[in-house]
Amino acid sequence: MTDKINVAIIGSGNIGTDLMIKVLRNSDILEMGAMVGIDPNSDGLARAARLNVPTTADGVQGLIGLDNFAAIDIVFDATSAGAHRSNAAALAPYGKKLVDLTPASIGPYVVPPVNLEQHLDGDVDNVNMVTCGGQATIPMVAAISAVTPVAYAEIVASIASKSAGPGTRANIDEFTETTSHAIEQVGGAARGKAIIVLNPAEPPLLMRDTVLALIGDADHDAIRASITGMAARVAEYVPGYRLKQDVQFTAIPDGEPVHTLLPDGTGPVTTKVSVFLEVEGAAHYLPAYAGNLDIMTSAALRTAESIARRIQNTIPAEVAP
């Protein structure tokens, strides 16, 4: 039997703790090597200790000082954009693979069903999981782009206010910037825009996402099939991910000033494609309404498992005497 790959999680908040539970319950290739935080009284560190996972409340330096640090191959960072930049610099001399769940964007953007395979080879040591809104919507933009050029794509991510912890709230600007860039770089849109809404409704509502894309004349059936197929691929690792309504195609009236949204050299556009999504969380640690956090941890887990398989394949087999 091949040994599991050891991982550490920096960030003992909502995302980090949910990710730990996923590794422990669901992964047949990853093993928890450490849970790292900065608050010794955090629930995440307490849960990790109860589950016999090594812990430290001294941040990244505490991780480096752990006895089993050398055995850890992959480090998840579920802190904040600013903290990740410091953590990445501290870990750089040690050759660890970093899976960044913050909007820091040091490494390339990864959305598993779209471009994960592109970043498993080579010398990529830091991959960025974009944002929750990006993980939910960029597959849809990419599905449309696979059929026809997308001149402009706009996404609106509506999440339950209760699911937004201090890290999420501190990174609202980074969320919009990172998601917008990834809509273009990964989704394939010529121009992207992202909006996040923290919904204070009680009881909390499930994550809802809207994707709007401006395209020229194209095969609507082919686009619909591409979107449906992509949704099924995301649902393989996020079972609560689903299309909430049928894909809608709306003709853009003559005189509509959509040219103001388009970058130079694109267009003309004749049709608006509307995709409506809902993401229900698996409720491993967080409530089901926190689909925004669940899709991030699920995407990060899938990415790390793919990295781990590559690591296993590069470990020389023991030579029998």
UniProtKB/Swiss-Prot annotation:
**Could you tell me which SMART domains the record lists for this protein?**
Semialdhyde_dh
**Keyword NAD listed:** yes
EC code(s) of this entry: 1.2.1.10
- Check the UniProt entry and state the signal peptide residues, or none: none
**Catalytic activity reported:** acetaldehyde + NAD(+) + CoA = acetyl-CoA + NADH + H(+)
**Per UniProt, which keywords does this protein have?**
Aromatic hydrocarbons catabolism, NAD, Oxidoreductase
Question: Which molecular-function annotations from GO does this UniProt entry contain?
Answer: acetaldehyde dehydrogenase (acetylating) activity; NAD binding
Entry annotation: catalytic residues: 132 (acyl-thioester intermediate)
The UniProt annotation places NAD(+) binding at 12-15, 163-171, 292
Question: What is stated as this protein's family in its record?
Answer: Belongs to the acetaldehyde dehydrogenase family.
- The keyword Ribonucleoprotein belongs to this UniProt entry's keyword annotation: no
A GO BP annotation: catabolic process
| Class in the EC hierarchy, top level | oxidoreductase
Give the protein's recorded name: Acetaldehyde dehydrogenase 1
